[in-house]
Structure formats: structure tokens, C-alpha cells
Amino acid sequence: MRKGIIISGNLAQDHEFIYPYYRLLEEDFEVDVCLLEGKPVKGFLGTDLPPNKNHKVKKIEEVNPNDYDILVLPGGVKAMEKVRQNLDIIKFISDFNAQNKIIACICSGAQLLISAKIVKGRKIAGYYSMKDDLINAGAIYTDLPAVVDRN
């Protein structure tokens, strides 16, 4: 079975977490949820994350990039401000990228890509307030709703 992982934290943008969570399940992925806090949290709009109360939340120390086929990084600027400070999470993202596996980054989740130093020379779409940060990190910023560049 294919495995996906969603990495985020408290105050993630609810729909940016929930939609990929259920879409992965619908596509028969086993989905792990790794939250900075190591326990269920609330989204920015108050939704329980993960939405399934029986879903076990993992800590970053419990996960290995070798075990997953896809990584999802939902947005939520308040969450990303804290998540990007966790060096173990940043290393996970960097190691995942080094294996050329799919990374789906939504909105301000691109902050994690900047911190992992994996945006240089890549087309990246992100929340408009991150445009300067992405360009300064070497990304080719686009305001398209979605973009694919390599993995």
C-alpha cells in the first residue's frame, strides 16, 4: 500500500489539511499525520486536526522519509512560523526531497521548502506575501493556482 504523510502544526489552515487528508485516503493511501506538537491540534478555523479523532498523531522522531511516497505540507502562516523552526522536520523535508519523492506544498507551506533550502531554481507557487521570500531563496515565483516542478 502507498503511504503519505502530512506534516503541520497547531493553527494550520483547516481546508489545506483536511482536503489532502481525505483525497489521499480516497486514493487508497495509508496516511500518517505528523504534528509539531505530537498530539491532535486545532486548525485556524477551529477544526480538529486530524479530523478523524481515532487517527494517531506521530512525532517527527517516529517517522522516516524512506517509509513514504508523498509528503503534504499544508499552509497556515501561524503554524508554519513554528513548524519551520523544528530542525528535525526541516531535515525530514530535505531528505524526502533528496529521494525525489512527491512533495505537495500548499500556500504558506512553502515556508518549509525555503527552510529546507530546496527551492532554488524551481517554479514555486505560494501565498503572495511570501513572494519576496521565495525569490530571495532562489525560487522562480509564480502566482498561478498550482505549479509542478520536478518532484
Label the model's feature ranges:
Residues 44-51:
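Acidic/histidine-rich helix-loop elements
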Residues 2-40, 52-151:
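Active-site-adjacent pocket-lining segments in enzyme domains
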